[in-house]
Amino acid sequence: MKAIVKPFIATALMGVFFLNSDVQAQEPSEKEVKQAFAPKGTHRAPFSKSKEVALTSVNLQFKFTTRQEQEKRKVGNVITWGFLEGVEDALLQEIADEYYKRLAAKLQAGGFSLSESYKDHKSYLKLVENNNDLPREINKKNWGISKIFTANKAPYIEYPTGMLGAHSALGNDLKMPVGQLFITIDFIEITQNISKGLSSYTLMDGSSRTDQFETDMRPVIRVEGVTAGSIGRALKGDGTYAKFTGGNWSYCNAIFRNDFSITSDIPYANNVEAAKGMPESMKKFKSDVVGDLVSIFSKGAVKNGRANLEATYTILANPQAYKNAVLDALDKYNDYLMAYIRENN
């Protein structure tokens, strides 16, 4: 068996990123929009006759630990972890607030004015009450760790997946699109490969195989879609989506497809460290979210004999560059969202 953890080559990749960062983003085509969003997300087109839009809750989910696993039957599996360091909560709130301003400007450029008439409506107050216990710190052992920040420190609201409820009544009563956004931002792109080799047997060495296990990565900001493991109610708080309800019980749910993502070309990493297994620095790292990260690795991750290759990458971010890269990816997301609204309303 051959296990390979590919090191991150900072100089080469940063050069590529800088070359790409000057390329201007283009409006997504109709085909690209269809590839990005799940089908049948609109009913009675809430945006079609309205010149006003309300945003009840704009939420950004920032991942700072990412886990990815690939398995090949009868060969083995690869588990790769990425850790993000150097980004503070104050910066994440700052990004969320700035994103709200950019989204509002994008909607206004599309012919919509922003309304805050929802704030005193009984259905909005009901939504706030129903969502007051939503966790802002997420720990999923097969996915990673994240924190959720709401723009302008507004209440964190999630619309139900069903059609009926306070969210529907709110849009219907106000007769305008009233929505909430949830956007997941990852910091790493992981690649994994498993190649089945040949089996052999010798008297001296016994049985052996030439299977090969590889993992690699690049530090890149990604707005990512719903993960493949989420269905039904689990779709809430996972992936990227914008849900609006409007007059005549209409709705517009722009939900990114499984595994779809938008990336930024702006580099943000100051340094990357690669290791097989869990690095010593991580054993001492205390997370504000879940305490000792060692406990997470004990849930089916590192040094328990379950993976043929177990690797970690620790990324130290430049805070300002991280902010620029995230906002760049979010600007691209806004282009997709507005294109979806135009084509489906």
Where are these regions (language model features)?
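A structural "domain/chain start" motif
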Residues: 25-138, 153-261, 265-345
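Surface-exposed intrinsically disordered loops and tails
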Residues: 141-145
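Bacterial Sec-dependent N-terminal signal peptides
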Residues: 1-30
